[in-house]
Amino acid sequence: MARLSYVRIKYLFFSWLAVFIGSWVIYVRYNSYTELCRGQECKTAICDKYRKGIIDGSACEGLCEKETIYFGKCLSAKPNNQIYLGIWGNLEGVIKCQMENTLHLDFGVDLEPRKEIVLFDKPTRGTTVQKFKEMVHSLVKKRLGDQGNLQDLVNLILKAADSNKDGHVSLPEAKSAWALLQLNEFLLMVILQDKEHTPKLLGYCGDLYITERVPYTSLYGISLPWIIEVFIPMGLRKRMDQWFTPSWPRKAKIVIGLLEFVEDIFHGLYGNFLMCDVSAKNFGYNDKYDLKMVDMRKIIPEMSLKEYIKYKSCESDSDCVYGADCGTTCDQSKRCTTDVTQPNLAKVCLLVKDYLLSGTPSEIRDELEKQIYSCIALKAATKHMEMEHALILNNLKALLWKKISHTNDS
């Protein structure tokens, strides 16, 4: 009997402990969700300004009047950047909304959430279209540098700002466009709107915008319920990521798309852009295994990084880092230099090394491995970097295309 009582007490104790831990985890998860997922709050703020005539855009009517835009699954990783899967009529998209004043770069420090910060205050009433053009030109010149074809970009931006396609940009449309232009991702989407690997902009209202949905939202890996993720060791998780990948020819096609995107942003029409968070979750692909960008918020103009980092004091190189992957060096005067140490191509090759070498056909494995390691070794500050960059990138693409061009999987 004593033995039976002991077993019962032990059983009750562990049952109570399991219930307690489970309840605590659910409570923490719920609190985290309510803090991270504030889509209704974002919609209310945007629609309030739309109804007051402050802002306008192609998505405003569907969001605030007809209610044909629905917020689905919350994907937000930070409270100030709201991201949701959404539906707009018969289109599937991704809804992105800013919950703070994110008008400048930060170096790892979260900004305070906005409370009464006045957004949509520019341009002011009475601003002419010509004056607005000058404002836009000045802004993109500051962000991108003095490129010779900035006027073409200004025209693209004004075309995007004319949401109802009536040939005129109203003041509410201009206020929305100006707020969106403060965001790196929106500016890059306008610049790369005709490129294959950039998601299409479906519409916007204020600084809320909707992009094309990418079916597969990570370069590799498997999405697991959070309750399972908690109990999986990091080493096993990384191995699992490599298990759940497409066939090798399809992986090669995805990587070719990633290399093409690197080409798109490397010293293009409007300057050079830097990839400051090169992680698998920022790259996806569609049903045809064409690469599509998932998140471009940490892809920034090189000129912007130089402008901000040159004033930063430092003790070591680790103080001169923006995002996860854009770093410069700390000089003897304890100031950050303005030249990045690693080009985009080297970061991308490091990301796809294990992904691409796993399952590689034996006849090209040695050559592919050699090229990938040469790519990883690229430095940004070398004398002939641009020539080496082009040579390595083209050789990699040619090797992969040659191997997969006659396969059905590609």
Curated annotation (Swiss-Prot):
Keywords: Disulfide bond, Endoplasmic reticulum, Membrane, Signal-anchor, Transmembrane, Transmembrane helix. GO terms for cellular component: endoplasmic reticulum membrane. Pfam families: PIP49_C, PIP49_N. Residues 1-5 are cytoplasmic. It comes from Xenopus laevis. The chain crosses the membrane at residues 6-26. This is Divergent protein kinase domain 1A. The lineage of its organism: Eukaryota, Metazoa, Chordata, Craniata, Vertebrata. Belongs to the DIPK family. Residues 27-410 are lumenal. It is a single-pass type II membrane protein. It is found in: Endoplasmic reticulum membrane. InterPro entries: FAM69_kinase_dom, FAM69_N.
